């Protein structure tokens, strides 16, 4: 691991932080930030080397996302989400890889994967329509991975349902402006996308189940450890890394603010044992959340690198660990922010923005614990979870 991208982020830290304020104002990642991210190759970290990528260890990717998010939450969020898409494109049809990366390896892809569209088969491909929310960083992307349900030729959904990941160029979808008016992660520009009767050739479509269970990468023939990693470990990694990084940024700004503060009782925070205890506990919890997430990806990497099978139980435990890491970090900042006093609520203080952005990150579907914890517990008890309990695992 070389951490080249991380070092370059550190060298531009002051500018990246300042641009986070601009992102909040304009409702998307600032153009200057996107230019910096492209210049240092932040989105190429998980991209194949044959297409100008770095094939970085996912731990290095996660740590780099954390740092970006600690400075500029919206940029870190986009880094974590858009930065995972090259990992999946690495085992899509070589023809679409060439279309996207052939002339510019810094081409970005948006999402989301949620099935907001319908694919109706036609000659050599599909007729594709739908609407999707939450397309993070979409203003800076030229292609998108969009989730859809497979239909028959009459437009009726296949039974049992079959989900697809559709790869589509910017010319075939519309970004709906003013569709991202939210209280947190405002600077991500996670706007709605609309597709109307676009033609999608077969080679630009991936079967969702095959992506998640590893069939797609095996069919492609990839042998690199990076691309053999489970989807359930890689896809959530950037999102949770960004969330933890935002919490680290919140803690940094809280410490800076509290260092010279006198509380309402006239006591310096440095002399207040109760606040100091809360800060200490929160610091330990955020560090533990970080270390847990990184150890989780290391553990999975070592297993895959050794050629061992990753069972459903192990995938479920990995997801359980990832979800809990996010919640632990969020709970920690909730012990810090209320102890920063009334002035910490002011909009000219970064504390409130980091707090809002961290909580918005917690709302992502990948951080919902219910079915993940349920499936992990059943697996440990020797049962085989079925149906919705297997979703995103």
From Swiss-Prot:
Q: Which cellular component, as a GO term, is one annotated location?
A: cytoplasm
Q: Which domain of life is it from?
A: Bacteria
SUPFAM superfamilies annotated for this entry? Acyl-CoA dehydrogenase C-terminal domain-like, Acyl-CoA dehydrogenase NM domain-like
User: Which Gene Ontology molecular function entries are recorded, alphabetically?
Assistant: acyl-CoA dehydrogenase activity; flavin adenine dinucleotide binding; oxidoreductase activity, acting on paired donors, with incorporation or reduction of molecular oxygen, reduced flavin or flavoprotein as one donor, and incorporation of one atom of oxygen; pigment binding
Q: Which Pfam families match?
A: Acyl-CoA_dh_2
Give the residues annotated as coiled coil: none
> Biological process (GO) annotations?
fatty acid beta-oxidation using acyl-CoA dehydrogenase
EC number assigned by the record: 1.-.-.-
**Keyword tags:** Oxidoreductase, Pigment
Role according to the record: Involved in pigment production acting as a hydroxylase that transforms indole to indoxyl, resulting in the formation of indigo.
- Per its record, how is this protein called by name? Pigment production hydroxylase
Q: Which organism is it from?
A: Rhodococcus erythropolis
């Amino acid at each position: 691991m070389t951490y080249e991208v991380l070092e370059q982020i550190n060298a531009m830290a002051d500018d990246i932080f300042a641009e986070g304020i601009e992102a909040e104002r304009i409702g998307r990642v600032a153009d200057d930030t996107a230019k910096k991210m492209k210049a240092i190759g932040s989105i190429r970290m998980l991209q194949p080397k044959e297409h100008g990528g770095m094939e970085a260890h996912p731990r290095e990717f996660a740590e780099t996302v954390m740092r970006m998010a600690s400075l500029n939450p919206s940029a870190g969020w986009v880094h974590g989400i858009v930065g995972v898409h090259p990992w999946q494109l690495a085992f899509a049809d070589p023809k679409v890889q060439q279309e996207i990366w052939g002339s510019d390896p810094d081409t970005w892809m948006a999402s989301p994967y949620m099935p907001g569209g319908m694919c109706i088969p036609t000659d050599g491909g599909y007729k594709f329509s739908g609407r999707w929310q939450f397309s993070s960083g979409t203003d800076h992307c030229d292609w998108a991975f969009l989730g859809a349900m497979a239909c028959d030729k009459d437009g009726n959904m296949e039974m049992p349902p079959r989900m697809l990941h559709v790869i589509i160029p910017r010319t075939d979808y519309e970004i709906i402006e003013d569709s991202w008016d939210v209280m947190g992660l405002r600077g991500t520009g996670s706007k709605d996308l609309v597709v109307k009767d676009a033609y999608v050739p077969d080679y630009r479509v991936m079967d969702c189940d095959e992506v998640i269970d590893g069939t797609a990468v095996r069919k492609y023939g990839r042998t690199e450890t990076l691309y053999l990693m489970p989807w359930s470990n890689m896809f959530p990694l950037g999102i949770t890394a960004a969330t933890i990084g935002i919490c680290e940024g919140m803690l940094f700004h809280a410490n800076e603010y509290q260092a010279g503060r006198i509380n309402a009782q006239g006591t310096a925070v440095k002399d207040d044992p109760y606040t100091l205890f809360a800060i200490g506990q929160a610091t330990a919890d955020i560090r533990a959340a970080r270390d847990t997430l990184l150890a989780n990806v290391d553990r999975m990497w070592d297993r895959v690198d050794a050629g061992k099978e990753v069972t459903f139980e192990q995938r479920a435990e990995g997801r359980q660990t990832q979800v809990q890491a996010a919640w632990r970090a969020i709970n920690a900042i909730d012990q810090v922010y209320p102890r920063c006093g009334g002035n910490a609520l002011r909009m000219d203080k970064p504390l409130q923005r980091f707090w809002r952005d961290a909580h918005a990150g917690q709302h992502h579907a990948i951080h919902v614990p219910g079915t993940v914890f349920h499936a992990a517990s059943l697996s440990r008890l020797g049962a085989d979870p079925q149906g919705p309990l297997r979703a995103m695992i």
